[in-house]
């Protein structure tokens, strides 16, 4: 988060003030003096970002890492991206030469026994950076009872996903259920497959490519999760939606 001068329109007047903006910088991941990837991201939880990105993109194994400013050096066996372009906050497979479909989930092992609406409300309450700036996405990992294990924020929804997966790896938790603050596209389902996520619950819509990949891989997607009637795609047996225990908005 950074503070910058702006002008605020208030009715018919213009008022100068200082506003809080979501920070966006280039994060460089290197290994053996070679650039693995450069990512436009929010410079928080960078260790989680690096670990999660390598896991979610299937780019090798990490033995150790060191964060120095906006550069992360990794020791391990890593595969560089085919391009040295910078991954922007809106980018998933932008610089990939071809779309490679990851192998699917072998079997359904997860049951969600919680109210989806309450889960999304709790996720929203765990977004301090969004509350300050209004300019970042969030990803939360839940257990089967709908309790939040970790929440991570970033200006890029792909980065928030990576950070949440990386945080789980660091604490030794095997993530199966993820909540997302935005829409679900193909690349987020691909990340879910690579990180062994079985259920994606999203505030936004589900794209056609995401739907096709999720069905072929055996994932369960929930779209428009904050609405009264969420849309569910895939294996319904994973969702046991409990009645809400709190007042509806």
Predicted regions and their residues:
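Feature captures the catalytic cores and cofactor-binding loops of soluble hydro-lyases/lyases
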Residues: 157-233, 238-244
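Phosphate/diphosphate-binding glycine-rich loops and adjacent basic-rich segments that engage nucleotide
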Residues: 91, 242-249
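Intrinsically disordered, low-complexity regions enriched in acidic/Ser/Thr/Pro/Gln residues
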Residues: 1-139, 143-144, 150
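Histidine/lysine/aspartate-rich catalytic loop segments that bind and position anionic ligands
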Residues: 128-171, 177
């Amino acid at each position: 988060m950074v503070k910058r001068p702006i002008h605020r329109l208030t009715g018919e007047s213009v008022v100068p003030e200082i506003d809080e903006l979501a920070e966006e910088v280039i994060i460089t991941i290197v290994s053996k003096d070679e650039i693995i990837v450069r990512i436009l991201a929010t410079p928080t939880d960078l260790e989680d970002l690096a670990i999660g990105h390598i896991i979610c993109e299937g780019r090798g194994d990490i033995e150790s890492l060191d964060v120095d400013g906006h550069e992360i050096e990794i020791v391990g066996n890593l595969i560089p991206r085919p391009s040295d372009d910078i991954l922007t906050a809106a980018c998933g497979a932008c610089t990939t030469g071809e779309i490679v479909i990851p192998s699917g989930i072998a079997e359904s092992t997860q049951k969600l026994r919680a109210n989806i609406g309450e889960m999304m409300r709790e996720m929203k309450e765990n977004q301090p950076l969004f509350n300050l700036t209004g300019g970042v996405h969030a990803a939360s990992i839940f257990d089967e009872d709908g309790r939040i294990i970790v929440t991570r924020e970033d200006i890029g929804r792909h980065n928030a996903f990576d950070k949440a997966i990386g945080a789980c790896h660091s604490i030794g938790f095997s993530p199966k259920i993820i909540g997302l603050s935005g829409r679900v596209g193909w690349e987020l389902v691909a990340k879910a497959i690579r990180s062994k996520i079985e259920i994606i619950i999203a505030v936004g819509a589900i794209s056609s490519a995401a739907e096709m990949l999720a069905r072929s891989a055996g994932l369960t997607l929930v779209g428009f999760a904050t609405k009264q009637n969420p849309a569910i795609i895939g294996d319904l047996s994973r969702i046991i939606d409990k009645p809400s225990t709190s007042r509806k908005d």
